[in-house]
């Protein structure tokens, strides 16, 4: 007898690891060669009415078939040893339940097979494997013994074979062989000798029983085959099962073909997930019903457009077909959740109470009248016409003046949600428009993210530091903002990740910037520009008294009103310890004082009830900054001008002197910029050309060199506003006339002697007032700027408005000459 163990016939084995007797490995049937007429009844005549019974777990033995069985139970081991010793046949039956350890008659199928023990193998792991070959079927009538092993009374059953001339049965056997080989080929490349053995085996009893033993079915179905005594009927039933199993194999192969392109050969887990995915497509089922149900419930409450609903439903169906462990599952889930979590057509109700809005804005911010006025105007229009598009405002000005915090107050005044995006250093366009979903880690842009965070479609949206945007090879974010900030386009803003248009027309965008020069012109055109200028000293004192001092007291745990800060003290802090346009540094200085006071309170030391100016040295140290004061008119050529800086207004002295020389030499010192140098040259040329008009001797220009100096040479200075100051200084130097006391001036000049307007008037005027100036000379066109300044800030000042240089000289210079004139 030749014995073959065919590894690749695994598909025809018992289901899998269930084919065990206790601790058994995978069991494979053995294909044997036999004669055409062999009926496997050799030695059957020696079998009596009683025979030893070997119960098998989940295994059914058929006549003629050789089957390896691993023996584990002590009773089974005892039975095998005695049967081998006596060279006797045994009865093999299948248990109904695999878990039964010590079966009785009711636990066994009563139809079994008489078997011969072909070989006993001692395995390396200590287990024992026996090879059994079936002989003839029998009926187990009763169990006569249960110890040391099972024995029972049996009745031998005969198989009915068709006539050899039965062509139908012959065709049936041929079909069974072909189908068996097809099943082998559908799973793997079968060995040629295996195919040859199946095709050329002429023993019909063996062919039928071998196939019955190897079908991938449960023991109950195999037992039904064993019960059938008519071989032809058994073959028909076998063919039915083979056809069914072959269709299943084909379906598995089809599933593998469908998923083959998506399979990563190195990831077994991914392969299994793709199989599950295709199975779910075939069955139309879904194992994530709860999560899908929640998403559908959310979607049912949305007021979104029809096209959005269509996209959502399409993407949700994709999600239904994915397994939770699939790599695409989390990506698809995130996308669907982003769609459903957006506030489609959901708006917070605006508060149209204008007095409430004004109170909120005045409470949180001192000054800023233009900005407040614009917000109140917008609120009034919304009250009258509810569907108006929100304005797009750009607040620009120096740092620390409250541009960003103003946005929060506007949101509170309107009772809208507040969101803020910092654009400083942004250089990737995808941060605005979002990343396309093809990229790993793709997400919505910052606009859509913050709309989702706000939960409404009409928040107050702060685009902070819009002037700090940069661009590189990843695109230009400023260009992406063109769509966001265009009222004619942002009703259909397209985010690359969502790939759906979203309406931003009701969002109130407020951009903040320090420098408009770095913002592209198309972007500037889309925004309403509102300047938030630096605070003057009086405004800083008010802000400190009303906001900063109470805030810092609360932050440092001091009782409200326990320490007072007189306005004079706050004024000294502003002038001597800070130099800024906003109030950030002022806030830090007040916090420093509060820390020292808190330390005293914690140490049970007494603290003053009021902080006086002379106490500031103890808390803040030595004075950090000093402001220029008017120094009189005792020197020819010294004139007081006015300048504007990023931290406010300043007075500016222009000094001109003459020295003996060849003439026509102009020296400029004081770290002057190009524009200021040109103003000095222009002033000298003008008075030279109009020397007679100013009563200047022409010979002075030929024999005297001119030196113009602006003090504080370490500080760069530039701008045209010192034009009339330089003319006055040079005329005073060439005529040795005194300059009028307590007078300052600012204005640009032309070669024709005209005076042009300049900017920063508010800051310059307040700087002059702090320096003790009483009179100011301004361009006639700057008169409109004076009207926008609060009257209390102008008290004690006299303004002279001029349009040409002669008027300036007549107002500024006295007829009286200085002491000890040069000529």
Swiss-Prot record:
Entry EC number(s): 3.4.21.53
Active-site residue numbers: 721, 764
UniProt-listed GO biological process terms: cellular response to heat; protein quality control for misfolded or incompletely synthesized proteins
A GO CC term assigned to this protein in UniProt: cytoplasm
Short name of one Pfam family: Lon_lid
Residue intervals of the Lon proteolytic domain: 633-815
Subcellular localization, as worded in the UniProt entry: Cytoplasm
Domain Lon N-terminal per the UniProt entry, residue ranges: 51-246
Predominant cellular place of this UniProt entry's protein: cytoplasm
Residues that coordinate or bind ATP: 397-404
Keyword field contains Protease: yes
Domain of life: Bacteria
HAMAP family xrefs: lon_bact
Purpose of the protein: ATP-dependent serine protease that mediates the selective degradation of mutant and abnormal proteins as well as certain short-lived regulatory proteins. Required for cellular homeostasis and for survival from DNA damage and developmental changes induced by stress. Degrades polypeptides processively to yield small peptide fragments that are 5 to 10 amino acids long. Binds to DNA in a double-stranded, site-specific manner.
Subunit note: Homohexamer. Organized in a ring with a central cavity.
Similarity annotation: Belongs to the peptidase S16 family.
Name of the protein in its database record: Lon protease
